[in-house]
Amino acid sequence: MTSLPAPVRWLYSLEWRRGFFDWARSDGVTWVYIFKVLAAAFLTLWLAMRLELPQPRTAMITVFIVMQPQSGHVFAKSFYRLLGTLAGSAMMVLLIALFAQNTELFLGALAIWVGVCSAGAARNRNFRAYGFVLAGYTAAMVGLPTLAHPEGAFMAAVWRVLEISLGLVCSTFVSAAILPQSASAAMRNALYQRFGAFAGFVSSGLRGPHASAAFETANLGFIAQAVGIEGLRSVTVFEDPHMRRRNGRLNRLNSEFMTLTTRFNALHQLLERLHGDQASTVFAAIEPGFLGLAERLDGFAGRGLTDADAARLAQQLADYKASLPEQVRSLRSAFLAREPNEADLLDFHTAFELLYRFVEELHSYALTHASLAEHRHEREQWDEPYVPKTNWLAASASGIRAAFILLVLGSYWVATAWPSGATMTLIAAATVGLSAATPNPKRMSFQMACGTFLGALIGFGEMFFVFPWIDGFPLLCLVLAPVFVFGAFLASRPAYMGVGVGLLIFFSTGSVPDNLTVYNPYTFINDYLGMVMGMLVCAAAGAIILPPNSRWLWRRLEQDLREQVVFAISGKLKGLGSAFESGTRDLLHQAYGFAAGQPQVQSALLRWMFVVLEVGHAVIELRKEQAILPVHPAYAESQPWRQSIRVMGRSLMRLFIQPSASNLERALVAVDHAISRAQASDEPFAPHFDTSVLRRVLSYLHFIRTSLLDPHSPLAALGRPQGNFHAA
């Protein structure tokens, strides 16, 4: 290899080089995004003006709405925007055909349509939500201006579809062709780094339980990563055929990771109790078996897991899993020599049953990750998709709020005949749609109003004091660029995103000239007054009409979280594990966002999630064990141990639907009865944990009992049940 010249080596050794690359990976990405926004916006505006489209600004606004730092997100938003625009335009033409001569009926039907679309956006909470948003406010944006001239409604819809299509084409072209940022690369990096953090978390947890705060923080991170990776997976199919061919394995990988975290949380909860019980000798007895896994994970902790690393990990885990049963028998013999009581023996068996299942899941995860290196693989076949869970009341509240806003503003417009009333109403429809899928629509609407007010001030200066003095498209770009740069910069900052969006979209709506520029200060001021008033009404409605960040929604989502146990008990077994895992985490992720700024509420929700996952997962394992029982009288449906498990299931359903001290007492009695019935039953197989069905059943029952009695669980706040509950 030829050595570099001395001056080049000197440049490479400078400290500024490291700082430059740090900047390029952080703020540099933002400035590349801003440059691409400018390029796409001005390309779209130039083409729209050259093609003499009626409203070139509509095409340019499309760029501001769909542009994202990563090209996959742009493709996804463009796809759903086009679908939403077509649906909204079709509905607008239908409403005009039905109610063109009756403004009141038209506004009522439009309000219902926008409400339904807003509810759909709140229910989906991904890029599909964007399709609902566009379907709602496209009908308003096209229908309201043409209400006075219904004969032009169809052509208005056609022109809008063409303008938006032009904006979508330019956005996707610029995003993919100029310094592209791939969502696929972001997803691969997230997958690689996620396992490194998890391996370190597990390795340290097997040696000694984590502190409560660190344990909760780590789990919140894993939940956010699972939800985020699912979002990335749904985006990468639009941009990367390499990832599209692995879509099933990526789905499977995320599902297996969620199961992994649940199994480790269950194991950690048991280890924490055993470690804190000074009188128990169980922790010392099981520790040698756990250290072997911790040592194997040490080599993968804190670094990315590549496909080759995953294959190596899978081989190590296969060897460890093969040697584990013999090691457990050896440790059990040594433990029995100490003459432990029944409760300690159950703890011993439960700990190794949980460990064995965790290793199985970890091995399966490693195999799936390693299979990503191949274009085709048998693990691609996966029919347990990620199943998001949304509260229907929260979605309905969003729809009711949107319909109410449109009815109020539309009625005001009809009653006053204000010339800018149509602008106020359609901008309110757009605002309520854009804010419907956010955790805090009040804040988003208010920020958009602030951005619009700022855009009005800047726009007035440019429209009446700058535009008359310029000539030609280059000078127009020159005077618009500072506003767009500032707006895009604000939009890239989460704390000021609403201000940036409002500035970009509504400065363009009211201040960017068409091919034939009309200078009318009266209309300009009235239109911007209508825009700001519509947004402020949206903000007020978001604060008053069923606000999503209020106590009622936290309580409802907490109830939905608890009812996931009911789903685990009564749901269809096929695909139940994945649906339970993803639905529970999705509910927690929503509730945690709605409860922002309320740490006590967030902590309570997180504790409920832990107990729901622990009990629900154990119930699903019990159901799976019973579904594959051998044909033998000892495992018949009529056996007392199976009947007692059904009774326990009904008791758990009552407890999690309506938590109370009496229901907790009944559930514990039912669990203890199921344990005693299983202990009293005989079976035809050797009593080893890898061959005995009843031993595995006992382990899961015992774990359910310890979860119900966990002092850190929210069930502990119900009060200590009366009586002496003991597994023996």
Residue ranges and their predicted role:
Residues 1-241, 245-246, 364-375, 380-610, ...:
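A transmembrane helix-and-boundary motif of multi-pass membrane transporters/channels
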Residues 546, 550, 572-663, 667:
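Extended, charge-rich low-complexity regions and/or helical-solenoid scaffolds
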Residues 195-206, 250-381, 565, 619-728:
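Soluble C-terminal extramembrane regulatory/interaction domains of multi-pass membrane proteins
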